[in-house]
Amino acid sequence: MPLSRLIINNFRNLQSLDLELSPNFNFIVGHNGSGKTSLLEAIFYLGHGRSFKSHISNRIIHYQAEDFVLHARIDEGQHQWSVGIQKKRSGDTLLKINGEDGNKISDLAHLLPMQVITPEGLTLLNGGPTFRRAFLDWGLFHQYTEFYSCWANLKRLLKQRNAALHQVRSYAELKPWDTELAKLAEIVSQMRANYAEALRPEIEKTCQFFLPELEIGVSFHQGWEKGTDYAEILAQGFERDKAMGYTMIGPQKADFRFRANGLPVEDVLSRGQLKLLMCVLRLAQGEYLVAQKERQCLFLIDDFASELDPIKRELLAHRLRESGSQVFVTAITKDQLNQMQWQESEQDSLFQVQQGMLTK
Protein backbone atom coordinates (compact mmCIF):
# COMPACT_ATOMS: atom_id res chain seq x y z
CA MET A 1 0.00 0.00 0.00
CA PRO A 2 2.15 2.92 -1.17
CA LEU A 3 2.02 6.35 0.40
CA SER A 4 1.00 8.84 -2.27
CA ARG A 5 1.09 11.95 -0.07
CA LEU A 6 2.74 12.80 3.25
CA ILE A 7 2.15 15.92 5.37
CA ILE A 8 4.43 16.62 8.33
CA ASN A 9 3.98 19.40 10.88
CA ASN A 10 6.37 20.08 13.78
CA PHE A 11 8.07 16.69 13.75
CA ARG A 12 11.63 17.37 14.99
CA ASN A 13 13.02 20.09 12.71
CA LEU A 14 10.43 19.42 9.99
CA GLN A 15 7.95 22.23 10.65
CA SER A 16 5.78 22.12 7.55
CA LEU A 17 6.21 19.67 4.68
CA ASP A 18 3.77 18.43 2.05
CA LEU A 19 5.19 15.71 -0.21
CA GLU A 20 3.76 14.01 -3.28
CA LEU A 21 5.50 10.64 -3.29
CA SER A 22 6.52 8.13 -5.92
CA PRO A 23 5.11 4.61 -5.60
CA ASN A 24 8.59 3.36 -6.50
CA PHE A 25 11.78 4.96 -5.17
CA ASN A 26 11.95 8.17 -3.13
CA PHE A 27 15.48 9.49 -2.64
CA ILE A 28 16.02 11.94 0.22
CA VAL A 29 19.28 13.89 0.05
CA GLY A 30 20.70 16.21 2.68
CA HIS A 31 23.64 16.82 4.98
CA ASN A 32 23.75 15.38 8.48
CA GLY A 33 21.24 17.20 10.69
CA SER A 34 19.21 18.44 7.72
CA GLY A 35 16.16 16.35 8.59
CA LYS A 36 16.39 13.52 6.07
CA THR A 37 16.40 10.78 8.73
CA SER A 38 13.57 12.61 10.52
CA LEU A 39 11.49 12.18 7.38
CA LEU A 40 11.97 8.40 7.56
CA GLU A 41 11.25 8.55 11.27
CA ALA A 42 7.94 10.32 10.60
CA ILE A 43 6.87 7.61 8.15
CA PHE A 44 7.85 4.97 10.69
CA TYR A 45 5.83 6.77 13.37
CA LEU A 46 2.75 6.67 11.15
CA GLY A 47 3.04 2.90 10.92
CA HIS A 48 4.04 2.14 14.51
CA GLY A 49 2.91 4.96 16.77
CA ARG A 50 6.47 5.30 18.01
CA SER A 51 9.92 6.38 16.86
CA PHE A 52 12.83 4.13 15.93
CA LYS A 53 15.21 6.68 17.49
CA SER A 54 13.62 7.86 20.76
CA HIS A 55 10.92 6.64 23.14
CA ILE A 56 10.42 10.14 24.57
CA SER A 57 7.73 11.92 22.53
CA ASN A 58 8.64 15.43 23.72
CA ARG A 59 12.02 15.08 22.03
CA ILE A 60 10.27 14.50 18.72
CA ILE A 61 7.94 17.50 18.91
CA HIS A 62 9.48 20.68 17.45
CA TYR A 63 10.79 22.83 20.29
CA GLN A 64 8.49 25.73 19.36
CA ALA A 65 5.33 23.61 19.14
CA GLU A 66 2.93 21.86 21.52
CA ASP A 67 2.27 18.89 19.25
CA PHE A 68 3.20 17.26 15.98
CA VAL A 69 0.80 16.10 13.29
CA LEU A 70 1.42 13.50 10.60
CA HIS A 71 -1.01 12.84 7.79
CA ALA A 72 -0.78 10.50 4.83
CA ARG A 73 -2.80 9.25 1.90
CA ILE A 74 -2.47 5.55 1.14
CA ASP A 75 -3.39 4.23 -2.31
CA GLU A 76 -3.95 0.62 -3.29
CA GLY A 77 -5.61 0.13 -6.63
CA GLN A 78 -9.10 1.59 -6.40
CA HIS A 79 -8.95 1.84 -2.61
CA GLN A 80 -7.69 4.89 -0.74
CA TRP A 81 -7.17 5.62 2.94
CA SER A 82 -6.49 8.87 4.76
CA VAL A 83 -4.57 8.37 8.00
CA GLY A 84 -3.36 10.82 10.61
CA ILE A 85 -1.76 10.93 14.03
CA GLN A 86 -1.36 13.83 16.46
CA LYS A 87 0.91 13.67 19.50
CA LYS A 88 0.75 16.36 22.21
CA ARG A 89 3.33 17.30 24.82
CA SER A 90 0.79 16.22 27.44
CA GLY A 91 1.15 12.70 26.08
CA ASP A 92 -2.30 12.57 24.48
CA THR A 93 -2.50 10.86 21.10
CA LEU A 94 -5.22 11.23 18.47
CA LEU A 95 -5.49 8.75 15.61
CA LYS A 96 -7.74 9.05 12.59
CA ILE A 97 -8.40 6.73 9.67
CA ASN A 98 -10.64 8.15 6.94
CA GLY A 99 -11.62 10.94 9.32
CA GLU A 100 -12.87 8.63 12.07
CA ASP A 101 -11.59 8.66 15.66
CA GLY A 102 -11.33 5.71 18.01
CA ASN A 103 -8.70 3.79 16.07
CA LYS A 104 -5.76 1.95 17.57
CA ILE A 105 -2.07 1.98 16.64
CA SER A 106 -2.51 -1.61 15.47
CA ASP A 107 -5.03 -0.38 12.87
CA LEU A 108 -2.42 2.00 11.43
CA ALA A 109 0.25 -0.70 11.56
CA HIS A 110 -1.99 -3.05 9.61
CA LEU A 111 -2.39 -0.49 6.83
CA LEU A 112 1.33 0.29 6.60
CA PRO A 113 3.58 -2.78 6.77
CA MET A 114 7.14 -1.52 6.56
CA GLN A 115 10.70 -2.69 7.02
CA VAL A 116 13.34 -0.33 8.39
CA ILE A 117 17.05 -0.63 7.61
CA THR A 118 19.22 1.66 9.75
CA PRO A 119 22.70 1.43 11.30
CA GLU A 120 20.99 0.68 14.63
CA GLY A 121 19.27 -2.31 13.02
CA LEU A 122 22.27 -4.54 13.70
CA THR A 123 20.70 -5.25 17.09
CA LEU A 124 18.62 -7.81 15.21
CA LEU A 125 21.80 -9.90 15.04
CA ASN A 126 24.06 -8.78 17.88
CA GLY A 127 21.40 -7.61 20.34
CA GLY A 128 19.29 -9.63 22.75
CA PRO A 129 16.39 -11.98 21.92
CA THR A 130 13.91 -9.10 22.32
CA PHE A 131 14.88 -7.75 18.88
CA ARG A 132 14.51 -11.14 17.18
CA ARG A 133 11.14 -11.79 18.83
CA ALA A 134 10.01 -8.42 17.47
CA PHE A 135 11.19 -9.52 14.02
CA LEU A 136 9.11 -12.70 14.21
CA ASP A 137 6.10 -11.00 15.73
CA TRP A 138 6.07 -8.33 12.99
CA GLY A 139 5.55 -11.08 10.44
CA LEU A 140 2.94 -12.82 12.56
CA PHE A 141 1.02 -9.58 13.06
CA HIS A 142 0.65 -9.14 9.31
CA GLN A 143 0.21 -12.86 8.58
CA TYR A 144 -2.43 -13.93 11.10
CA THR A 145 -5.37 -11.74 12.11
CA GLU A 146 -5.74 -13.55 15.43
CA PHE A 147 -2.10 -13.14 16.50
CA TYR A 148 -2.31 -9.60 17.86
CA SER A 149 -5.11 -10.30 20.33
CA CYS A 150 -3.39 -13.49 21.53
CA TRP A 151 -0.07 -11.68 21.93
CA ALA A 152 -1.65 -8.71 23.74
CA ASN A 153 -3.54 -11.00 26.14
CA LEU A 154 -0.37 -12.99 26.76
CA LYS A 155 1.52 -9.81 27.70
CA ARG A 156 -1.32 -8.77 30.00
CA LEU A 157 -1.39 -12.14 31.78
CA LEU A 158 2.38 -12.20 32.22
CA LYS A 159 2.27 -8.73 33.76
CA GLN A 160 -0.54 -9.78 36.10
CA ARG A 161 1.26 -12.98 37.06
CA ASN A 162 4.47 -11.12 37.84
CA ALA A 163 2.54 -8.71 40.06
CA ALA A 164 0.75 -11.61 41.77
CA LEU A 165 4.06 -13.34 42.53
CA HIS A 166 4.76 -10.58 45.06
CA GLN A 167 1.44 -11.14 46.83
CA VAL A 168 0.43 -14.82 46.82
CA ARG A 169 1.58 -17.29 49.45
CA SER A 170 0.78 -20.57 47.73
CA TYR A 171 0.65 -21.82 44.16
CA ALA A 172 -3.08 -22.50 44.48
CA GLU A 173 -3.64 -18.73 44.52
CA LEU A 174 -1.67 -18.33 41.29
CA LYS A 175 -3.07 -21.29 39.37
CA PRO A 176 -6.04 -19.43 37.79
CA TRP A 177 -3.57 -17.12 36.01
CA ASP A 178 -1.37 -20.02 34.98
CA THR A 179 -4.18 -22.04 33.43
CA GLU A 180 -5.05 -19.25 31.02
CA LEU A 181 -1.43 -18.18 30.56
CA ALA A 182 -0.32 -21.68 29.58
CA LYS A 183 -3.05 -21.96 26.94
CA LEU A 184 -2.12 -18.63 25.36
CA ALA A 185 1.61 -19.39 25.56
CA GLU A 186 1.11 -22.63 23.63
CA ILE A 187 -0.99 -20.86 20.97
CA VAL A 188 1.46 -17.98 20.48
CA SER A 189 4.48 -20.28 20.47
CA GLN A 190 2.90 -22.58 17.90
CA MET A 191 2.15 -19.62 15.63
CA ARG A 192 5.73 -18.43 16.04
CA ALA A 193 7.10 -21.89 15.28
CA ASN A 194 4.91 -22.28 12.18
CA TYR A 195 5.86 -18.85 10.87
CA ALA A 196 9.57 -19.37 11.57
CA GLU A 197 9.49 -22.68 9.71
CA ALA A 198 7.69 -21.12 6.74
CA LEU A 199 10.07 -18.15 6.63
CA ARG A 200 13.23 -20.23 7.06
CA PRO A 201 13.59 -21.41 3.40
CA GLU A 202 12.94 -17.86 2.17
CA ILE A 203 15.70 -16.53 4.40
CA GLU A 204 18.12 -19.27 3.42
CA LYS A 205 17.41 -18.80 -0.30
CA THR A 206 17.87 -15.02 -0.10
CA CYS A 207 21.05 -15.44 1.96
CA GLN A 208 22.42 -17.81 -0.67
CA PHE A 209 21.89 -15.11 -3.29
CA PHE A 210 23.63 -12.34 -1.33
CA LEU A 211 26.09 -14.34 0.80
CA PRO A 212 26.92 -17.47 -1.22
CA GLU A 213 30.21 -17.88 0.64
CA LEU A 214 28.33 -18.60 3.88
CA GLU A 215 25.88 -21.25 4.98
CA ILE A 216 23.27 -19.34 6.98
CA GLY A 217 21.00 -21.38 9.24
CA VAL A 218 18.04 -20.25 11.34
CA SER A 219 16.32 -21.87 14.29
CA PHE A 220 13.40 -21.00 16.56
CA HIS A 221 13.51 -21.53 20.34
CA GLN A 222 10.16 -21.18 22.06
CA GLY A 223 11.46 -20.15 25.49
CA TRP A 224 11.08 -23.47 27.30
CA GLU A 225 12.15 -27.03 26.58
CA LYS A 226 10.48 -28.41 23.49
CA GLY A 227 8.01 -31.22 24.12
CA THR A 228 7.33 -30.25 27.73
CA ASP A 229 4.03 -28.95 29.07
CA TYR A 230 4.25 -25.24 29.87
CA ALA A 231 1.60 -25.46 32.59
CA GLU A 232 3.76 -28.00 34.43
CA ILE A 233 6.83 -25.80 34.04
CA LEU A 234 4.96 -22.87 35.59
CA ALA A 235 3.85 -25.02 38.52
CA GLN A 236 7.32 -26.50 39.07
CA GLY A 237 8.97 -23.08 38.88
CA PHE A 238 6.61 -21.31 41.28
CA GLU A 239 9.03 -21.04 44.22
CA ARG A 240 11.85 -19.87 41.96
CA ASP A 241 9.65 -17.31 40.19
CA LYS A 242 8.28 -16.06 43.51
CA ALA A 243 11.80 -15.60 44.86
CA MET A 244 12.88 -13.73 41.71
CA GLY A 245 9.66 -11.72 41.44
CA TYR A 246 8.98 -12.51 37.78
CA THR A 247 8.27 -15.41 35.41
CA MET A 248 11.66 -16.73 34.32
CA ILE A 249 10.64 -19.23 31.63
CA GLY A 250 8.14 -18.89 28.80
CA PRO A 251 7.32 -17.30 25.44
CA GLN A 252 8.71 -13.98 26.66
CA LYS A 253 12.14 -15.66 26.41
CA ALA A 254 11.70 -17.00 22.86
CA ASP A 255 14.47 -16.46 20.32
CA PHE A 256 15.03 -16.75 16.56
CA ARG A 257 18.72 -17.49 16.12
CA PHE A 258 21.00 -17.14 13.12
CA ARG A 259 24.19 -19.12 12.52
CA ALA A 260 26.88 -18.89 9.84
CA ASN A 261 28.72 -22.11 9.05
CA GLY A 262 27.39 -23.54 12.30
CA LEU A 263 28.47 -20.66 14.55
CA PRO A 264 26.56 -17.64 15.93
CA VAL A 265 26.67 -14.93 13.25
CA GLU A 266 27.72 -12.23 15.71
CA ASP A 267 30.87 -14.25 16.49
CA VAL A 268 32.11 -14.89 12.95
CA LEU A 269 30.83 -12.19 10.58
CA SER A 270 32.41 -8.80 9.96
CA ARG A 271 30.35 -5.65 10.50
CA GLY A 272 29.89 -5.38 6.75
CA GLN A 273 28.62 -8.95 6.55
CA LEU A 274 26.33 -8.38 9.53
CA LYS A 275 24.95 -5.24 7.88
CA LEU A 276 24.28 -7.14 4.67
CA LEU A 277 22.68 -10.05 6.53
CA MET A 278 20.41 -7.64 8.40
CA CYS A 279 19.35 -6.11 5.07
CA VAL A 280 18.77 -9.58 3.63
CA LEU A 281 16.59 -10.65 6.56
CA ARG A 282 14.41 -7.54 6.25
CA LEU A 283 14.17 -8.01 2.50
CA ALA A 284 13.28 -11.71 2.75
CA GLN A 285 10.58 -11.04 5.33
CA GLY A 286 9.09 -8.20 3.30
CA GLU A 287 9.09 -10.28 0.12
CA TYR A 288 7.49 -13.19 1.99
CA LEU A 289 4.66 -10.90 3.14
CA VAL A 290 4.08 -9.75 -0.43
CA ALA A 291 4.00 -13.35 -1.70
CA GLN A 292 1.67 -14.61 1.03
CA LYS A 293 -0.74 -11.72 1.46
CA GLU A 294 -0.37 -9.90 -1.88
CA ARG A 295 0.27 -6.68 0.03
CA GLN A 296 3.03 -4.20 -0.61
CA CYS A 297 5.72 -3.65 2.00
CA LEU A 298 7.45 -0.27 2.39
CA PHE A 299 11.21 -0.14 2.88
CA LEU A 300 12.85 2.73 4.79
CA ILE A 301 16.62 2.74 4.30
CA ASP A 302 18.89 5.14 6.19
CA ASP A 303 22.66 5.37 5.70
CA PHE A 304 22.63 2.58 3.14
CA ALA A 305 26.16 3.18 1.90
CA SER A 306 28.04 2.44 5.10
CA GLU A 307 29.86 -0.88 5.43
CA LEU A 308 28.52 -2.45 2.21
CA ASP A 309 30.80 -3.05 -0.75
CA PRO A 310 29.72 -1.71 -4.18
CA ILE A 311 28.77 -5.12 -5.58
CA LYS A 312 26.49 -5.95 -2.66
CA ARG A 313 24.94 -2.47 -2.78
CA GLU A 314 24.13 -2.92 -6.45
CA LEU A 315 22.64 -6.38 -5.84
CA LEU A 316 20.44 -5.07 -3.04
CA ALA A 317 19.32 -2.01 -5.02
CA HIS A 318 18.44 -4.21 -8.00
CA ARG A 319 16.52 -6.67 -5.81
CA LEU A 320 14.50 -3.87 -4.21
CA ARG A 321 13.76 -2.43 -7.65
CA GLU A 322 12.54 -5.83 -8.84
CA SER A 323 10.29 -6.25 -5.80
CA GLY A 324 8.04 -3.40 -6.93
CA SER A 325 8.00 -2.04 -3.39
CA GLN A 326 7.85 1.60 -2.38
CA VAL A 327 11.32 2.48 -1.09
CA PHE A 328 12.66 5.52 0.77
CA VAL A 329 16.45 5.97 0.71
CA THR A 330 18.53 8.70 2.38
CA ALA A 331 21.93 9.94 1.27
CA ILE A 332 24.14 12.95 2.00
CA THR A 333 24.55 13.93 -1.68
CA LYS A 334 23.18 12.86 -5.04
CA ASP A 335 26.68 11.72 -5.99
CA GLN A 336 26.56 9.35 -3.04
CA LEU A 337 23.38 7.84 -4.47
CA ASN A 338 25.22 7.19 -7.72
CA GLN A 339 28.08 5.60 -5.78
CA MET A 340 25.53 3.40 -4.01
CA GLN A 341 24.45 2.06 -7.42
CA TRP A 342 20.91 3.44 -7.18
CA GLN A 343 19.69 4.03 -10.72
CA GLU A 344 16.96 6.64 -10.99
CA SER A 345 13.99 6.07 -13.28
CA GLU A 346 11.37 8.54 -14.51
CA GLN A 347 8.91 7.27 -11.89
CA ASP A 348 11.25 8.01 -8.97
CA SER A 349 11.27 11.14 -6.81
CA LEU A 350 14.30 12.99 -5.49
CA PHE A 351 13.94 15.35 -2.52
CA GLN A 352 16.56 17.77 -1.21
CA VAL A 353 16.35 18.51 2.53
CA GLN A 354 18.11 21.50 4.09
CA GLN A 355 17.50 22.70 7.66
CA GLY A 356 14.09 21.07 7.76
CA MET A 357 12.98 22.55 4.41
CA LEU A 358 12.45 20.43 1.34
CA THR A 359 12.57 20.88 -2.42
CA LYS A 360 11.83 18.36 -5.14
UniProtKB/Swiss-Prot annotation:
Localization annotation: Cytoplasm
Parts of the chain that traverse the membrane: none
GO biological process, one term: DNA synthesis involved in DNA repair
Pfam families registered for this protein in UniProt: SMC_N
Protein keywords: ATP-binding, Cytoplasm, DNA damage, DNA repair, DNA replication, DNA-binding, Nucleotide-binding, SOS response
GO CC annotations, alphabetized: cytoplasm
GO molecular function: ATP binding; single-stranded DNA binding
Residues binding ATP: 30-37
Protein's UniProt keywords contain Zinc: no
Principal subcellular localisation of the protein: cytoplasm
Family affiliation: Belongs to the RecF family.
NCBIfam families: recf
Record's function text: The RecF protein is involved in DNA metabolism; it is required for DNA replication and normal SOS inducibility. RecF binds preferentially to single-stranded, linear DNA. It also seems to bind ATP.
HAMAP family attached to this UniProt entry: RecF
Name the record gives this protein: DNA replication and repair protein RecF
UniProt source species: Actinobacillus pleuropneumoniae serotype 5b (strain L20)
